[in-house]
């Protein structure tokens, strides 16, 4: 039996580093938070090769005395708490005394620090072991340089993401910290290029402009509220400025970025049903009595335990509701200025070229895209909330459509209304149709859920829809039959399936027809989004979006695909947002994602079809890759056999 023994200090530091230091972004977070706790008003972060080669954080804080440097790199040595009372009244971002020891255990670290006296101190550590300490010259403050991260833990190094992804994680964490501390001037540079600089003047809206762009900042609303326990201040976007994920929601508690599902839900509740299943851009800064907050529950302190959470949630919801009360919902989603020259951007209406440019690209494209800022995991509660929101919106839309149908056209279309030439379309054989039409490529999608009223044999035949005889139309649904079976067709889902197949086929064959612009459109992005999209320009071109890097977090669009319908600027923004929030990591999956999103946007309303149009829809469904569902998995066709109908009416009992 193995004997119990005490682990060495170096080994315990490496174990602790496994919890605290996960990647280069973790190093940046810990060092910047230390600088904030040292009362710094200016902090500069520089990384080389996405932090994999070197990370440097310099501040003008209080510095460390020469005789305290060794203690600073010892585990559980800190200046921030003294006793148990301090542990439950934490007013600093750090308090465990693990950060520097954990970093030094897995990297080469050099520190240059001064308290403002005549002599500064320089020291170096590697693998948790001190290499040297000497006097040096430096202004007041501290500069810590971390190199060769995980050099002695190759397994950890192996599982890091690509340099691009690791850089985006650093950008994300610096953005969050900057939003939580507008009073501090923060600079982030990568390989000598400045990615972010905040002024440190305490103006939160100016920081939002620096991080997310000026146009976003202009559409942010101030929220304020307080009660005896909490003070709330922040900015939330207008209801018509949304994103596809929660990544643009930042909740800061006593200056610390946290993840809290209930508080995020309270923010969404303040919008009511205005978001349409999407998410706002928001920065909520909450000040609370430290006694109400327990931050000692998670290694990275992103998750906290909060007393009176329900009271705080109500405070947030009411503040957001009040801020949105006077919002003009008729305002446009995005106001983009056309490009005139590189020194002047005038607000002019863009004109479209009358000609359609055929741009065919023979070269195949493959691009790895990773999801970087992982959103909070969706729980059953999240899915339930989103489903309820979508169902309410659909019910409201259906009521309006039914009202329009009653006043504009009969709900039922009888076959007697179909012309003789349409009867030919209805009755021509499957083989004959295949010869006359160009079938679209089969959809190699994932496994889909079966309809509750279809048999296993039906599921095996899912890729083939028989030639149906149209019976009629009611409320946007088609009724048809084949060999005694009744088929119910949701025309919106069916049209979306056909639209999806058509768009995907053109994308996969790289046969995008493009509409050119006389004046390029300017799109501004946050630092995070810009860095991600800049590497996806080849993919955007394959999608039919001719965009070029214009610098300063800006892209120019010269043309767009003709399958993109509706208001161009809005549709392009939504498409780019979908790409940014996607977790897909290969080009083919992203093409399917884009095609599905475009089909959903292009087909959104039920309409009354003529007999010929309804018959043509049924005929085209026979060539669909999966006629029974649209790309999102929503049922398009349901078959009811005579046996199913008998069961519904409980015959035979």
From Swiss-Prot:
GO biological process, one term: mismatch repair
Gene Ontology cellular component annotations, sorted alphabetically: mismatch repair complex
GO MF annotation, one: ATP-dependent DNA damage sensor activity
Biased composition (Basic and acidic residues): 375-408
Keyword DNA damage in record: yes
Any one Pfam family match given in the protein's UniProt record, by short name: MutL_C
Keywords: DNA damage, DNA repair
Annotated spans, Disordered: 368-413
InterPro entries: DNA_mismatch_repair_CS, DNA_mismatch_repair_MutL, DNA_mismatch_S5_2-like, HATPase_C_sf, MutL/Mlh/PMS, MutL/Mlh/Pms-like, MutL_C, MutL_C_dimsub
Function description: This protein is involved in the repair of mismatches in DNA. It is required for dam-dependent methyl-directed DNA mismatch repair. May act as a 'molecular matchmaker', a protein that promotes the formation of a stable complex between two or more DNA-binding proteins in an ATP-dependent manner without itself being part of a final effector complex.
Family per similarity comment: Belongs to the DNA mismatch repair MutL/HexB family.
PANTHER family linked: DNA MISMATCH REPAIR PROTEIN MLH, PMS, MUTL, DNA MISMATCH REPAIR PROTEIN MLH1
Annotated HAMAP family: DNA_mis_repair
Name of this protein: DNA mismatch repair protein MutL
Native species: Lactobacillus delbrueckii subsp. bulgaricus (strain ATCC 11842 / DSM 20081 / BCRC 10696 / JCM 1002 / NBRC 13953 / NCIMB 11778 / NCTC 12712 / WDCM 00102 / Lb 14)
Gene field: mutL
